[in-house]
UniProtKB/Swiss-Prot annotation:
GO terms for cellular component: Golgi membrane. The gene is St8sia6. This is Alpha-2,8-sialyltransferase 8F. InterPro entries: Glyco_trans_29, Glycosyltr_29_Sialyltrsf, GT29-like_sf, Sialyl_trans. It comes from Mus musculus. It is an enzyme of class 2 (transferase).
Length: 398
């Protein structure tokens, strides 16, 4: 009996061991064993602490190694983006001429940086703009900021003046016409060739307020890339003179063309040069006589002078700011979120694909009149600081 009891005890112990092994080593034991063996081989060459925990059979395969790796990569990207922002500051402050390829390489690097709106940066920059320029009160000429009897000096020809009499005064809105300010989402649409085949139209049209520059075409096939919604469009008086022949023979064509902008404001620099005044007033009279839906506004010369001084302190010293930079500056004051489309002063994409200067033609600006690379480096800085967002390529479509 004693030997029989010993045999039963031995059998019981073996069964217990077998049961424990089954509990200890589930069906994935072979794969886990390979992982453990690989871990033991790696341990001598600096295995991470997370991987060493695999030696505990009850510990699941950890994900901490990947998480740590991703955290490290994120930190590296953040540091590189900070360095890039510093480099942009240097780029805009230096006087030496940078090549187009230098800028394109910088933009390639910027695209690797995640973009997030930075509320504090935005508020600080907007406060500085408001302090110097005050678009809310002074962006356009109004009866409130320019009473009858004002002897208004021109923006560029500052020694020249125009007295504001009743007939001119009544062309002005009573106050600033942007009644829904601040707008949540604003799109400032430039005319760069980068917009061709961008498919940004739907995204642009979802914006609460859309700014456009210099009466660009927005109908037909162009609308899928540039959208059609327009709340404000600038008008360069030279367009009225050259394209529409001072609204004499081509008045009907002008009225037909601007009808595509719905009830948008038409913004003209009537008081930048004396030569602009008469033709700008003629646009106003033409729309009034034809009972058009669009309303004419005039840039306030004081606002433009102050804005030029603001950007001059940041290195933009060209003869005159581009319309795009003017409107982007206005948008920062009027809007909570600003996105720029079609701002691309380069002859090719970052993939080296040739581009036309505008999405509708290849007419180049006057040499030396604007300072596009300097302006663009400032816009890149605003992008990197989370103040506004630049669209560099095609838009994502649903």
């Amino acid at each position: 009996m004693r030997s029989g009891g010993t045999l039963f005890a031995l059998i019981g112990s073996l069964m217990l061991l077998l049961l424990l092994r089954m509990l200890w080593c589930p069906a994935d034991a072979p794969a886990r064993s390979r992982l453990l063996m690989e871990g033991s081989r790696e341990d001598t060459s600096g295995t991470s602490a997370a991987l060493k925990t695999l030696w505990s059979p009850t510990t699941p395969v950890p994900r901490t190694r990947n998480s740590t790796y991703l955290d490290e990569k994120t930190t590296q990207i953040t540091e590189k983006c900070k360095d890039l922002q510093y480099s942009l500051n240097s780029l805009s402050n230096k006087t030496r001429r940078y090549s187009e390829d230098d800028y394109l390489q910088t933009i390639t690097n910027i695209q690797r940086c995640p973009w997030n709106r930075q509320a504090e940066e935005y508020d600080n920059f907007r406060a500085k703009l408001a302090s110097c320029c005050d678009a809310i009160q002074d962006f356009v000429v109004s009866q409130n900021n320019t009473p009858v009897g004002t002897n208004m000096s021109y923006e560029v020809e500052s020694k020249k003046h125009i007295p504001i009499r009743e007939n001119i005064f009544h062309m002005f809105p009573v106050s600033q016409p942007f009644v829904d300010y601040p707008y949540n989402q604003c799109a400032v649409v430039g005319n760069g060739g980068i917009l061709n085949k961008s498919l940004c139209g739907a995204e642009i049209d979802k914006s609460d307020f859309v700014f456009r520059c210099n009466l660009p075409p927005i109908t037909g096939s162009a609308s899928k890339d540039v959208g059609s919604k327009t709340n404000l469009v600038t008008v360069n008086p030279s367009i009225i003179t050259l394209k529409y022949q001072n609204l004499k023979e081509k008045k009907a064509q002008f009225l037909e063309d601007i009808s595509t902008y719905g009830d948008a404001f038409l913004l003209l620099p009537a008081f930048s040069y004396r030569a602009n005044t008469g033709i700008s007033f003629k646009v106003y009279q033409t729309l009034k006589e034809s009972k058009m839906r669009q309303k004419v506004l005039f840039f306030h010369p004081r606002y433009l002078r102050h804005l030029a001084l603001f950007w001059r302190t940041k290195g933009v010293t060209a003869y005159r700011l581009s319309t795009g930079l003017m409107i982007a500056s206005v948008a920062v004051e009027l809007c909570e979120n600003v996105k720029l489309y079609g701002f691309w002063p380069f002859s090719k994409t970052i993939e080296d694909t040739p581009l036309s200067h505008h999405y509708y033609d290849n007419m180049l600006p006057k040499h030396g009149f604007h300072q596009m690379p300097k302006e663009y480096s400032q816009m890149l800085q605003l992008h990197m600081r989370g103040i506004l967002k630049l669209q560099f390529s095609k838009c994502e479509t649903a």
